[in-house]
A protein has these predicted regions:
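Single conserved hydrophobic/aromatic residue that forms the stacking wall/gate
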Residues: 1-11
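N-terminal glycine-rich FAD/FM-binding segment characteristic of electron-transfer flavoproteins
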Residues: 9-202
Length: 202
């Protein structure tokens, strides 16, 4: 989605620490019209992030909100769905293709055994799959322009949003380490180990 295709203004919104400004400037260099940072040093759970985004979105009233399907830290896959419920927006998840047609969006999503295409009314929340789009490279002139553009930074504490976490992290455990592999000298040795040790053949 880029402004040159006549799809309206593109706003980049992010919840995070002050160093998140780097990602916002990258978005500006790639063609976003505005960038908004809801700034906090706290580690927020999906519900809190959805509340913050809801507050920002209510002020802007966009017709389409696009999010990643899940964060790489918690891997929760919850924020988009919670946000759609809070705003009473249509929603579609795991989108690999999105086509906008006036007041509707046609969304193709990968499911077990094939592809599913659904039609949702706008405004809508869509979470994306990696296959939706291949990011473009920003040109050097646009990178330099983005450095001079003003960012809209809003401390979360001033937004009147309850960001208290409702979840308690009890533990994080690494998976069991795999046994180191061995090399065998011959096919006979391999067959013997598969029979006697692995017991996968008889």
């Amino acid at each position: 989605f880029v402004p040159s295709r006549g799809l309206g203004d593109v706003y980049k919104r992010q919840v995070g620490k002050s160093d998140s400004q780097e990602q916002l400037r990258t978005a500006l260099a790639l063609g976003a019209d505005r960038a908004i940072l809801a700034e906090t040093d706290s580690l927020l759970e999906p519900l809190a992030i959805a509340k913050v985004l809801s507050k920002v979105i209510e002020e802007e009233s966009p017709k389409l909100v696009i999010l990643g399907k899940q964060a790489i830290d918690g891997d929760n896959n919850q924020t988009g769905q919670m946000l759609a419920a809070m705003l009473n927006y249509s929603q579609a998840t795991f989108a690999s293709e999105v086509i906008i047609d006036e007041d509707f969006a046609s969304v193709t999503r990968e499911i077990d055994g094939g592809l599913q295409t659904i039609k949702v009314s706008l405004p809508a929340i869509i979470t994306t799959d990696l296959r939706l789009n291949e990011p473009r490279y920003a040109s050097l002139p646009n990178i330099m322009k983005a450095k001079k553009k003003e960012l809209d930074v809003k401390p979360i504490e001033e937004m009147g949003v309850d960001i208290n976490n409702r979840m308690e992290l009890l533990s994080v455990e690494l998976p069991a380490s795999r046994q180191e592999g061995i090399k065998v000298e011959s096919v006979e040795d391999l067959v013997s180990k598969l029979k006697e040790e692995a017991k996968v053949i008889s």
